[in-house]
Regions:
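Structural motif
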Residues: 3-12
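Extracellular carbohydrate-recognition regions
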Residues: 13-41
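Short tryptophan-centered beta-strand motifs in secreted/extracellular beta-sheet-rich domains
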Residues: 27, 81-83, 135-146, 151-153
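Secretory/extracellular carbohydrate-interaction modules
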Residues: 50-121
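Short, aromatic/His-centered strand-loop micro-motif at the edge of beta-sheets
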Residues: 119-141
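Flexible glycan-contacting loops in extracellular carbohydrate-active proteins
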Residues: 163-193
Length: 193
């Protein structure tokens, strides 16, 4: 027997390639993760996803992986997304929020960093939106325009920043929350052992 991890999956059927309606989820209405049939969950032993009252909770102590939740939405060129966000700490960890096309290519990313910054990636650089406090709830509203390649972020009703998309996409079809940076290594050009 190999020492590799063994993965077991539960995939709801029928599998849907396209969403019929935009997300309008209130997590307080759910008692169990199995009820989140419109969400794709990547929950690990050391990076679990759970429900706690009105919150969908992502935790992470895994050095090599992350927790991830993703919601498929209808293909949209002008999108408004709103959610409440609270971090339990601001001195460790990373939360990334990405807006993706049908192929999983992100056009925009928001991050809560281990430096206590809430920032947005625009082009090749990041722009700081605000310093976030642990235990404080933030009402975040994000407006994305595929035609203008722009994202505008509002926090608690105030404009926090505007950034250009870092990748052009034909439409936005997914919203994703992840507790770590996307893995891009190894690549096809990585030398063999």
């Amino acid at each position: 027997v190999n020492k590799e991890d063994m993965w077991v999956s539960h995939i709801p059927v029928p599998v849907r390639a396209h969403a019929s309606a935009h997300a309008d989820d209130n997590f307080a209405n759910y008692k169990d993760l199995n009820e989140l049939t419109d969400w794709n969950l990547y929950s690990l032993q050391w990076a679990p996803v759970s429900l706690d009252g009105k919150w969908l909770v992502l935790q992470d102590k895994d050095l090599f992986d992350y927790a991830r939740v993703e919601r498929k939405i209808p293909a949209t060129k002008e999108l408004k997304v709103s959610f409440e966000l609270m971090a339990e700490q601001n001195d460790k960890g990373l939360l990334q929020i990405e807006f993706l096309d049908e192929n999983g290519i992100a056009c925009s990313r928001l991050e809560l960093t281990s430096d206590g910054l809430f920032r947005a990636k625009g082009g090749a650089r990041f722009g700081n939106l605000l310093k976030y406090e642990p235990g404080k709830t933030y009402k975040v509203e994000v407006e994305l325009s595929v035609a203008n390649r722009m994202v505008t972020v509002y926090v608690d009703g105030k404009k926090a920043g505007q950034r250009m998309f870092f990748a052009p996409v034909p439409a936005i079809e997914r919203v994703m929350f992840r507790t770590g940076a996307q893995r891009t290594y190894p690549t096809v050009d990585t030398p063999a052992d």
